[in-house]
A protein has these predicted regions:
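A generic, well-ordered mixed alpha/beta core segment in the N-terminal half of proteins
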Residues: 62-131
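N-terminal amphipathic/basic leader segments beginning at the initiator methionine
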Residues: 2-26
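N-terminal glycine-rich anion-binding loops that anchor highly charged ligand groups
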Residues: 2, 25-50
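A generic structural motif
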Residues: 13-17, 54-60, 96-103
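Acidic, His- and aromatic-enriched active-site or binding-groove loops in soluble protein domains
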Residues: 146-164
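Short, charge-patterned binding micro-sites
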Residues: 39-56, 83-98
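Conserved small/polar residues in nucleotide/adenosyl-binding loops
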Residues: 182-184
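Short, low-order "capping/linker" segments at domain edges
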Residues: 94-104, 108, 135-152
Length: 184
């Protein structure tokens, strides 16, 4: 890896049981030039997949957008059970500046991904942590409160209009929270 700029990303997907789906979700991270898949782990009890990858900002952007599309296509939260709180097929997408990148660049990447996944997959997106647009959205627990089932009503409230995308929960994929932070 002789990349000039590196950002880490640790997306969490609401699938931890179906290995075929997991392989399809992770596939864009394996094949995209400029992206390195560092690790992924699934938990059957939580029904959750956590992926850790690093990459150049533009390559990371492309791989994340593709993986979100796979998750939206494969995961139906109406059929989802698990011990971990969740509000979306892709629950959270954190971006962490690692090398020759600033927090501002990570925030810009989070907004670019948010705009794109909202546009092409019709997902409502909330920005939180360092990317938050309002103080009541900085904490993930506040954003996620109500989870998938309660988000259909919550998202109608003026203070919970999404930062990007439609002001209604996606019928099967829910909502997604995207953020930038200093470290995990």
């Amino acid at each position: 890896m002789s990349w000039n700029k590196i950002i880490e990303c640790v997306p969490n997907f609401s699938e931890g049981r179906d290995l075929e789906k997991i392989d399809q979700i992770v596939a864009p991270f394996r094949i995209k030039a400029g992206v390195k898949l560092l690790d992924y782990s699934n938990d059957e009890d939580h029904n959750r997949l956590v992926v850790t990858l690093v990459g150049e900002p533009e390559a990371l952007y492309e791989a994340i957008v593709e993986a979100v599309g796979v998750a939206v296509r494969l995961i139906d939260l109406n059929q989802h059970t698990g011990q971990h709180p969740r509000m979306g097929a892709v629950d959270v997408i954190p971006f962490i500046p690692i090398k020759n990148t600033s927090m501002e660049e990570a925030i810009e990447l989070s907004k670019k991904v948010a705009a794109k996944v909202a546009e092409i997959y019709h997902l409502p997106v909330f920005l939180y942590e360092k990317s938050a647009t309002a103080s009541h959205r900085e904490n993930l627990a506040s954003v996620r409160k109500g989870e998938f089932e309660g988000m259909a009503e919550k998202i109608k409230l003026p203070e919970w209009q999404p930062d990007f995308g439609p002001a209604e929960r996606h019928p099967t994929a829910g909502t997604v929270a995207i953020l930038s932070l200093i470290h995990i």
